[in-house]
Amino acid sequence: MKDVLDARRTELVVEYNGKDITRSLADSLVDFTYNDAAPGSLDDIQLSLEDRLQNWQGPWSPSAGDTIKAEIRTFGWNYPEEEQKLPCGTFEVDSFDFGGPPDTVSIKAVSLPVDSGIRQEKRTKAWENVTLRTLAGDVARAAGLTLFYSADVDPSYERLEQTDQSDLGFLNEQAMKEGIAVKVSEGQLVLFDEAEYEKKDPALTLVRGEDAVASHKFGWSTAYTAYRACEVTYSDSTKNKTYQAMYVPPGAPAEGPVLKINEQVDSEAAAMRLAAKSLREKNKEAGKASLSLSGDVRMASGVTLLLQGWNRFDGKYLIESASHKVGSGGYTTDIEIRKVLGW
């Protein structure tokens, strides 16, 4: 095993505006971070570079919207002659910082086109007789993105009110109520059903004391006590009608706190759907943890894994976000995870 560890090597491959700058970057790289963000947040990459020759603060100085494509490659990571790749994607530069001494620069790029207004421009608009997929399609087109909708359900609405919100923020809000996650990746606006991802077989197993877990953090708090059920009640004064629904998940205890929601719905079915999805969203907070590992290209948002050896915290988890870092400390991966709900 020591020979394998000694032979380990990591390479960062970078294209800037379509030009391969891997070699010229190697001598000045301090560290590189790829954040595969949780749903609702943008993926990003960050480059920290030594700049004693003043190239990055001078002739190479980035401009907003410049494209950076990055890939992490590992060699001999688990056995001799093994090669693995983690394509991080293509990003657009949205910030640049320069400081010193010694002179260093930091370049950050995000997965959303920086000239798109869907993230920052606030709008007020009424959406009538619309489905979630149609709403997402409109937002995608406005940003120059392709819609990838991976969910069996496509909720419909008589009317939605967008009030002083960005298009992306409004879409995130509506999707979250339906238990559907939103991400922007590789020119796509992606919507997927988190519950379906939870059902997938674990992609890998981490065993305490056997796998390369450098540190771990688990815990619980009464502030995040799981609710046993959710009740939705809404009185529609225009129709003189009250909609009510109670959702109790399989295996719920006979006693415990009930989450109560008073939010606009237009049918009993919509009330039940809101109750189930709201309970999922709330109870996700009760089983969160974080792990720091030796670099692992398998770690990605949406992947399920099995933990063994952490006693009461053992079980199946979903990766919410993964941060991959390459630098003087080698290649490391940090993940934020939550226990799957199972319903």
PLM features: residue spans?
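Soluble periplasmic/extracytoplasmic beta-strand elements of cell-envelope proteins
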Residues: Q46-S48, K69-E71, T90-D94, S106-V110, ...
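Amphipathic, non-transmembrane alpha-helical segments in extracytoplasmic/periplasmic proteins
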Residues: I45-S48, A109, R123-F148, Q162-S185, ...
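Assembly/oligomerization scaffold segments
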Residues: M1-V114
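Short, compositionally biased
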Residues: E82-F98, K125, A195-E198, L318-Y331
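Solvent-exposed coil/turn segments that connect beta secondary-structure elements
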Residues: N17-K19, E50-R52, R73-F75, E92-P101, ...
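Short beta-strand-centered interaction patches in the first periplasmic/extracellular domains
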Residues: K2, T104-I107, S111-D115, Y149-A214
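An acidic/polar, Gly/Ser/Thr-rich interaction patch typically located in mid-to-C-terminal regions
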Residues: F32-S63, D211-W343
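Short solvent-exposed strand/turn elements
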Residues: T104-R119, Y331-W343
